[in-house]
Amino acid sequence: MKAKEIYDILRAGGLSRAGALGMLGNMAAESGLKENIAQRGMTKLSDEQYTAAADNGLIDFVNDSVGYGLCQWTFRTRKQGRMEMAKSYGVSVGDGALQCDYALFELRRDYPALMRFLCTTDDIDLASDRICMEFERPAVNNLQARRGYAHGFEDEITESSYHPPIKDPIQATFPPDPTVLALQLWLNYNGYACETNGYKSGNFFSVMEKFIADMKNC
């Protein structure tokens, strides 16, 4: 996936320029920005074969401990989330835009303090370091290499070249209507006095943000 394509999605997702460059640097260190790459030495399949097998349920993608994709997601719950989002979007688990969306989703859900930092910081080095240590958590914290990649993209992608995507990176809806209905029923069943009629099938983040807001307001 091209660096600028990733940069545009990350910026549209709220990351500052430094935050987006820091994430790009980490992705480059993890995967070389190859969206369908499977961890070297962990599978005998080619990247294309592994991706096709994952999409068709021919391998235990969630539990096989093979790092995969732009961020080399490895842990089973993270890979499961990736797979579920891919199915809901109707795209391959190797889709690059999907993976950028999922990284942003994880930041919002699981790393809110880091997300707030990445949306406001102008420090590329610190952004790169924190993503490595808090989000990626590799066996070896090669911080300098990740910083180097990030600054390389700083020279390659000028701020004047940034143009927000006109449309969402992925147009398919998530979650599907049955999932939205399940959220409504769960709220009602558990006695929450929330307005649930506002849910409708649409962008994953808009649905989940409404759900979280409803929970806070109950």
Across the structure, where does each feature detected by a protein language model lie?
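Solvent-exposed, polar/charged alpha-helical surfaces in well-ordered, non-transmembrane soluble domains
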Residues: 4, 8, 21-24, 101, ...
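Surface-exposed patches in mature extracellular/periplasmic domains of secreted proteins
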Residues: 14-24, 35-42, 113-123, 127, ...
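Export/targeting segments at the very N-terminus of extracytoplasmic proteins
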Residues: 1-32
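Acidic helix/loop microenvironments that form the catalytic cleft of cell-wall polysaccharide enzymes
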Residues: 27-31, 73-74, 118-141, 202-217
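Peptidoglycan-targeting cell-wall enzymes and recognition modules
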Residues: 5, 31-119
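Solvent-exposed, acidic/flexible segments
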Residues: 3, 13-20, 63-66, 92-100, ...
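Non-catalytic cell-wall polysaccharide-engagement segments
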Residues: 79-169, 173
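Short acidic, glycine/serine/threonine-rich helix-capping segments at coil-helix boundaries
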Residues: 166-181, 185-218
